[in-house]
């Protein structure tokens, strides 16, 4: 599923080789070219009107939601099914960002369920590529008040208090609900998140002031969702390109208590392959497998899906 964005680019087509087809109201199909700004490619989605379709095998042609309706806990495991129900719990995307991604925030599960009858949105970003000068904004450099945040969004100075990260290929960022975040520059990401599209746009770098580029701003709606404390460095994992400064602990948050003591998260073998834990959270665990040979995983031994 392709998604046009004003900050998108052409890398999903030209570099990843993705093929997107759009249909007009008459059913005519057109292949999306490199002149179209595609910001997102939804690789695995169970989002109602936007569902992934199985490409091959004996279930080819079925959507993920149809398979979930039929096989229930056999797909995701009993524990996950009991919590998430019939919706596949993860949404996986590729992002191609070539301009400024709006300053935004996502709610947690409790708020999302109470106000919108949806899941919240915890997510991770894995940096596939980042050009020199690219920036990720995540959290604040110091504690601020809701009033200061509101005023700075209105007078276009919010970037002065946002924590700035200069990402490198292989870095991992864990964006917890309530964390204000944005991007500036040329960067390609893998995004793994809960199955939710609840995003509250807080500031759009001036685009909101131009009738040609204006998109809805949700500042008042989201003001009580924001974590106004300084950025939690446990949420950022520097990849191998940082050399001696690289991190080998998984991303987490202090609330998850996985940064307060030693863990056995070094590289470990799984059937002879190298596995690294990138993120540990209540919503998901994400690992990186460095494969040199075919890998066979017997899912019956796990209580969840792989």
Where are these regions (language model features)?
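Active-site glycine-rich loop that binds ribose-phosphate moieties when present
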Residues: 144-174
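Transition-metal
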Residues: 1-144, 204-251, 267, 286
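C-terminal accessory segment of soluble enzyme catalytic cores
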Residues: 274-290
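Histidine-centered metal-binding segments
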Residues: 248-270
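A short hydrophobic beta-strand segment most commonly corresponding to one strand
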Residues: 123-125, 182-206
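Conserved metal-binding segment of the jelly-roll/cupin
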Residues: 103-106, 166-185, 192-194
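A conserved acidic, glycine/proline-rich C-terminal tail/linker
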Residues: 290-306
């Amino acid at each position: 599923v392709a998604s046009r964005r004003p900050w998108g680019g052409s890398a999903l087509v030209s570099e990843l080789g993705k093929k997107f087809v759009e249909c007009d109201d008459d059913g005519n199909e057109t292949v999306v070219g490199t002149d179209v700004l595609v910001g997102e490619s939804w690789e695995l989605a169970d989002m109602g009107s936007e569902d992934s379709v199985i490409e091959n095998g004996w279930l080819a042609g079925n959507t993920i939601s149809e398979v979930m309706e039929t096989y229930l806990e056999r797909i995701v495991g009993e524990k996950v099914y009991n919590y998430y129900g019939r919706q596949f719990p993860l949404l996986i995307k590729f992002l191609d960002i070539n301009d400024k991604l709006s300053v935004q925030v996502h709610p947690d599960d409790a708020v999302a369920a109470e106000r919108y009858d949806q899941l919240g949105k915890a997510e991770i970003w894995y940096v596939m590529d980042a050009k020199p000068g690219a920036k990720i904004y995540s959290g604040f450099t110091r504690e601020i008040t809701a009033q200061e945040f509101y005023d700075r969004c209105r007078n276009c100075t919010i970037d002065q208090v946002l924590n700035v990260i200069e990402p490198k290929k292989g870095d991992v960022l864990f964006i917890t609900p309530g964390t204000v975040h944005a991007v500036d520059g040329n960067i390609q990401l893998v995004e793994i998140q809960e199955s939710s599209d609840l995003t509250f746009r807080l500031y759009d770098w001036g685009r909101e002031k131009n009738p040609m580029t204006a998109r809805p701003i949700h500042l008042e709606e989201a003001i009580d969702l924001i974590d106004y404390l300084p950025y939690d460095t446990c949420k950022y994992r520097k990849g191998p390109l940082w050399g001696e400064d690289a991190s080998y602990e998984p991303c987490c948050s202090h609330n998850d208590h996985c940064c307060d003591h030693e863990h056995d998260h070094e590289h470990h073998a799984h059937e002879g392959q190298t596995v690294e834990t990138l993120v540990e959270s209540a919503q998901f665990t994400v690992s990186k497998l460095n494969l040199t040979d075919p890998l066979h995983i017997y899912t019956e031994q796990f209580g969840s899906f792989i």
